[in-house]
């Protein structure tokens, strides 16, 4: 029978509930337990797939094509497990399923209410995750802050789960902000007390309180929190600021958080083995020399829009004992008059994914600069498309070469809608999830993967137009990765250059600590070797 841990947040949002939940998952997995994780978001969107990156940040894609919250990227990287659509549920998805059921008459004419119908649907997602994953522990993060009106159905649902399953099977971890007032030089615990009281008014008593702060809390402060929040002092855990999120599991392990959980939930665990985490942290410690990468994107004002790409770069850098320094370049501010000066001294250039016309010309200039100066280049999704279009314009002299996404009237549509895709609806209509890419023998990408196939995830609705393959091959572009089932181009490269590789798929979604994705590892290796 699965055990359940629910992670909630109080006082303010943005405290790092996702990192806390991920770290708990990492500690339990290091204790020999099978872990599954999920996120409940209170917003009414069905999923984040149609949300602006400025509103939501990155859309993380699961292996089965779920468009999910960026916290799932943390989950997968920390517990090194592939999650599914079951790992991401929104209020919108819950309400939609309940209302659709009502329209079909499955409720036998009953009045549809938040309790029990919405709460039952939420509980079903939790129990379904336990059944399908067969995990020892299900860790569920509840988005938002306790007290938010949007979160109340989720709080009520997890209260009911505790009632149904018992304290020995359900645990509540509450993440809060411990305030430090610099003027009076003292900690203030009242916001924590009020947050716990708000939870108590909803029928939930936290078992563990995780205090976010920039330094360890004194014993008397922990005693005060323990007294007024009715939580044992041993269960008041410090979560202090770290220079890397990958230090958090070790910091929590030092406070025996895993033992507290294992004891309450009566889990049959092994002695914890943190050797991989310690090894990874040693890599971080030894990475002092910087390499600078120009990151040419559309949404750089919100770096969370590229979270998995950034983490993948860091992970690959640490593999070579290098610290990654990002030079942020706003794509729509690059033009013919300034791109050479802006990109001068770049050790590597990366163009990530995105949608829409804005910034496209600047991205093409970045791709051209990398190609003409033999600077290692990695293009992802849109970055692959603009690299290919740039080659068509510059080397084939097709000045109007484009994608029909940006110019429906182009006479050289290098990229067009994927055949059979829904053009009328936006949500859930992309080519999504893990696909098998066949890699061409002796290509650079096949050497990087050390295989003739790559299993990577996708999120796009435009594909390369195969009518132009021979023309582009004639100027040196190699089509080294193909989705054979539908003859979709997945990877292109320029063999004449040190490293010029671009993929339609998103390799950032499969990077893990100690296991960088081959494309990122190859990209960083090329930069290191190019700067010896």
From Swiss-Prot:
Its EC number is 6.3.4.2. GO terms for cellular component: cytosol. Residues 292-532 form the Glutamine amidotransferase type-1 domain. GO terms for molecular function: ATP binding; CTP synthase activity; glutaminase activity; identical protein binding; metal ion binding. Catalyzes the ATP-dependent amination of UTP to CTP with either L-glutamine or ammonia as the source of nitrogen. Regulates intracellular CTP levels through interactions with the four ribonucleotide triphosphates. PROSITE patterns: GATASE_TYPE_1. Pathway: Pyrimidine metabolism; CTP biosynthesis via de novo pathway; CTP from UDP: step 2/2. It comes from Mycoplasma mycoides subsp. mycoides SC (strain CCUG 32753 / NCTC 10114 / PG1). The active site is at 381 (nucleophile), 506, 508. Disulfide bonds: none annotated. L-glutamine binds at residues 54, 354, 382-385, 405, 461. Residues 1-267 are annotated as: Amidoligase domain. Allosterically activated by GTP, when glutamine is the substrate; GTP has no effect on the reaction when ammonia is the substrate. The allosteric effector GTP functions by stabilizing the protein conformation that binds the tetrahedral intermediate(s) formed during glutamine hydrolysis. Inhibited by the product CTP, via allosteric rather than competitive inhibition. Homotetramer. It catalyses: UTP + L-glutamine + ATP + H2O = CTP + L-glutamate + ADP + phosphate + 2 H(+); L-glutamine + H2O = L-glutamate + NH4(+); UTP + NH4(+) + ATP = CTP + ADP + phosphate + 2 H(+). The gene is pyrG. ATP binds at residues 14-19, 71. It is an enzyme of class 6 (ligase). CTPSs have evolved a hybrid strategy for distinguishing between UTP and CTP. The overlapping regions of the product feedback inhibitory and substrate sites recognize a common feature in both compounds, the triphosphate moiety. To differentiate isosteric substrate and product pyrimidine rings, an additional pocket far from the expected kinase/ligase catalytic site, specifically recognizes the cytosine and ribose portions of the product inhibitor. Belongs to the CTP synthase family. GO terms for biological process: 'de novo' CTP biosynthetic process; pyrimidine nucleobase biosynthetic process. This is CTP synthase.
